[in-house]
Regions:
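Hydrophobic alpha-helical membrane-insertion signals
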Residues: 1-30
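Generic alpha-helical segment signature
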Residues: 12, 25, 38, 58, ...
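Short secondary-structure boundary/capping segments within folded domains
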Residues: 20-23, 54, 210
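Basic, short loop/linker segments at the boundary and entry of helix-turn-helix/winged-helix-like folds
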Residues: 25-67, 72, 369
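Helical catalytic core of nucleic-acid polymerases
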Residues: 59, 84-87, 91
Length: 485
């Protein structure tokens, strides 16, 4: 018989409503609550609060709200606060009841300003150390990469600092003071000349021939064992990847308390300075050479590479494919290399000129003052182990960034560099928490499987000595004694 729903009449009071019973045992927030201790933040932010005045929202609750904001990729903090009363799982995670008052959305922005970046950095470091204690981090091999993040600002907010000062009004006094500090010259790069009035820390960046946008850049170090993020760093989008390798190694060693043995990265990190840095630190650099990777493009297409020239250490000269001698001419102090050249009048008459150089001054080569050490590092970067690590990096690092997309990392939630650092620490911490929970569940499943195997083994042994088995053995012995078998 079909049933009909009666007219809904809301109850004035609800009895025996237990939020803990409403949240499933396998809920992600329940797992996070079991694994992570949020009470540490009381000690971290104690000095940022006074002893008088109104009582604030509990710091662990604020941190949990920010995690929910990232975990569920909620569009705004205002929307988060409006949604919390309707989500029983969020209420349970935050320690609220059905009729508790939800704080204003401004609580989160004020907390970020009050706490600063250091608190969120400490939270990320605690999660990394928790992964280390769980045996999920090896720490000896460092995989590093970077990715661009769109700033929360439009290209229309970019202004030219040359013409801006003539049109500034009273509301732009702060920006004018900032421009005076920059001391911009006409020969400076574009990001020193152009600035966004909405987000001054973001830089105009173009990626892979696409459109120029205001962007930041996140640099990330991932451990190969369980893909735990051991270090993360935010810069403006114009910073080269290779310039932060030293800092990434230092952050990784500080967070893991382990020395790096091998660094694996793409060719953007394969600069001479980075190879020599790894040599100085005693670290193996499994990094493709930037020069060799991008060789054969542009003006260098179809030109003899440096390896086609033979170096004679006795005479300190190079010999070109045509047999001509290139002698040492100049020393570049800033780049720390010598320049070797052949006479231009010889290059002009050479039959191999079209394949050797397009310069009217003839072919020139550069040799670093630490070329011997550099050559050994480049040789290490071409061995079989290095090629295998470079191939592993392609999917390991890209997968880490791909997982971040579900948390909205491709676009900045807030403006200014220090707020971007907070967003980056929260996303990286959440990814590590996910790894921690997943491997804990796998460990429990493995233990349960082992226990089940032991029970099945003991059951088989018990069945071997059961009463029915004993009768069968006696019957077989009896028939054999009578000669019936």
């Amino acid at each position: 018989m079909m049933g009909y729903q009666s007219n809904f009449q809301p109850k004035l009071f609800y009895y025996n409503v237990n939020l803990d019973q409403r949240v499933p045992q396998n809920h992600s927030l329940r797992k996070i609550n079991e694994k992570i201790d949020f009470d540490f933040i009381y000690k971290e932010v104690r000095d940022t609060y006074g002893i008088n005045g109104n009582v604030s929202i509990a710091p662990p609750v604020i941190l949990k709200m920010m995690l929910i904001l990232i975990l569920y990729n909620v569009r705004s903090e205002r929307e988060l606060m409006n949604t919390i009363p309707f989500r029983l799982d969020w209420l349970w995670f935050l320690g609220y009841d059905l009729d508790d008052e939800i704080p204003n959305h401004s609580v989160l922005s004020k907390a970020r300003t009050r706490w600063g970046v250091a608190v969120f950095k400490r939270f990320f470091e605690r999660i990394v150390w928790q992964c280390i204690e769980a045996g999920l981090v090896d720490g000896s091999k460092l995989f590093t990469d970077s990715s661009l993040i769109d700033a929360d600002a439009s290209n229309n907010s970019v202004v030219d600092t040359y013409s801006l000062k003539r049109h500034l009004n009273k509301s732009y006094r702060r920006l004018e003071e900032r421009l005076d500090d920059l001391k911009v010259q006409k020969s400076t790069p574009a990001n020193s000349r152009y600035i966004s009035t909405t987000d001054p820390d973001a830089s105009v960046t173009r990626h892979s021939g696409g459109k120029s946008k205001l962007r930041y850049k996140t640099h990330r170090a991932v451990d190969a064992k369980c893909e735990v993020i051991t270090a993360t760093h935010i810069t403006t989008g114009s910073v080269d990847d290779g310039d932060v390798l030293r800092e990434m190694i230092e952050i990784h060693e500080q967070n893991t308390r382990k020395s790096v043995d091998t660094v694996v990265a793409d060719s953007k990190y394969g600069t001479i300075d980075n190879f020599l840095l790894c040599h100085k630190l005693g670290v193996k650099a499994h990094i493709p050479s930037f020069e060799k990777t991008h060789r054969g493009s542009g003006r260098q297409k179809g030109i003899f590479p440096k390896e086609a020239f033979s170096y004679n250490p006795d005479t300190d000269t190079f010999t070109c494919p045509a047999g001509q001698i290139l002698k040492r001419r100049n020393y570049h102090k800033k780049r720390k290399h010598y320049e070797y050249k052949a006479p231009s009048k010889i290059c002009v008459l050479c039959e191999l000129r079209e394949r050797c150089t397009r310069s009217k001054y003839g072919r020139s080569l550069k040799r670093h003052i630490q070329q011997d050490e550099l050559g050994r590092m480049l040789a290490y970067a071409r061995n079989r182990e290095a090629k295998r690590d470079i191939k592993t990096r392609q999917h390991l690092s890209e997968r880490s960034f791909a997982q971040s997309k579900r948390y909205g990392y491709k676009r900045a939630r807030w403006r200014r560099l220090w707020r971007m650092e907070i967003q980056d620490f929260l996303i990286a911490a959440l990814q590590n928490i996910t790894v921690l929970i997943r491997h804990s569940e796998e460990k429990i499943s493995k233990s349960n499987a082992q226990i089940g195997q032991i029970i099945r083994t003991q059951r088989v042994k018990w069945e071997d000595f059961s009463f029915g088995s004993l009768l069968m053995r006696l019957f077989n012995q009896f028939t054999m004694a009578l000669g019936l078998v």
